[in-house]
A protein has these predicted regions:
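Short Pro-Gly-centered flexible turn/kink motifs
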Residues: 43-45, 161-179
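Short, solvent-exposed loop/edge-beta patches enriched in aromatic
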Residues: 11, 38-41, 163-168, 258-263
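Substrate-binding groove/exosite segments of carbohydrate-active enzymes
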Residues: 150-152, 167, 209-263
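Short beta-strand segments enriched in hydrophobic/aromatic residues
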Residues: 8, 49-51, 175-177
Length: 263
């Protein structure tokens, strides 16, 4: 997980962002954003969520960008968007795609966004600049236009909010990948409050702490012992450790080398 905090004294706002992948059957990443008024005056602002979607695996990074986007099919819903490209292709041929990519968001009361910008073109404008999108800098609302075959964007605009001094507001973003169609309303119902996010966060911490203790070694070198705890939560490397049990000579040699390295 990752927790990040930023404060802008000139603007008068502080943001705290928690990102993690919760333990459970859902292939999702949660992002909880808490905005606090740290000034001595009322502050009004319009919150946006903006998650660019490539909607392909890393294997497709070097595919023809325009052709890739032409295969994109976007579905706009109450809480966000779902993207399901029609085909996957490379030099060996074409095959149907079954993977769905999605972004959904809500405030801490479970209310969805007022407006959704389903493509980068609609959100960024003609410049295509993700760092200065026209939707934000020129206060543009999304226009009804053809969205299929375009580069997708999980961008959403919430209603204007005014925070008194010391007050805060929270937004939850759910991002995911699935091999079947996902119900965004159900996901928001499951994760769409800070109390629920915090419960899943504590469960996630507990799970990984237990995983890190599955292999407990006291070598006399704290750096080496901590490194082994880290290795313990790496699925591929953990499989390697199980193989080493059948080859103790290799295990002892590696331990000796690493022990010497961490002295």
């Amino acid at each position: 997980w990752q927790r990040m905090s930023r404060k802008n004294k000139k603007v008068g706002l502080k943001s705290e962002i928690l990102s993690f992948i919760p333990i459970g059957p859902d292939a999702v990443e949660l992002m909880q954003v808490v905005i606090t008024n740290v000034s001595n005056r009322k502050i009004s602002f319009i919150p946006y969520v903006a998650i660019p979607l490539y909607a392909r695996s890393a294997d497709n990074l070097r595919d023809h960008r325009h052709v890739t986007s032409l295969l994109t099919r976007i579905k706009e819903e109450k809480y966000g968007i779902k993207v399901k490209p029609t085909l996957l292709f490379n030099e060996s041929g074409h095959r149907p795609n079954n993977t769905v990519y999605y972004v959904a968001a809500c405030d801490n009361q479970g209310r969805g966004p007022q407006y959704i910008y389903p493509t980068q073109e609609i959100f960024c404008g003609e410049s295509g600049d993700l760092e200065a999108p026209e939707a934000v800098f020129e206060n543009k609302l999304p226009q009804k236009t053809f969205i299929q075959g375009k580069e997708p964007m999980g961008a959403m605009r919430f209603g204007k909010i005014t925070l008194p001094p010391g007050a805060q507001t929270t937004y939850i973003i759910v991002m995911g990948i699935s091999q079947k169609d996902s119900n965004l309303s159900s996901l928001i119902n499951k994760f769409g409050k800070s109390t629920k996010v915090n419960v899943y966060f504590e469960k996630t911490i507990s799970f990984w702490q237990k995983q890190a203790k599955l292999l407990d070694i006291s070598s006399g070198n704290d750096h080496f012992d901590n490194w082994l705890r880290w290795v313990n939560i790496q699925p591929v490397l953990f499989t390697g450790f199980r193989l080493w049990k059948r080859r103790p000579g290799l295990a002892r040699s590696l331990a000796g080398l690493l022990g010497a390295y961490f002295k």
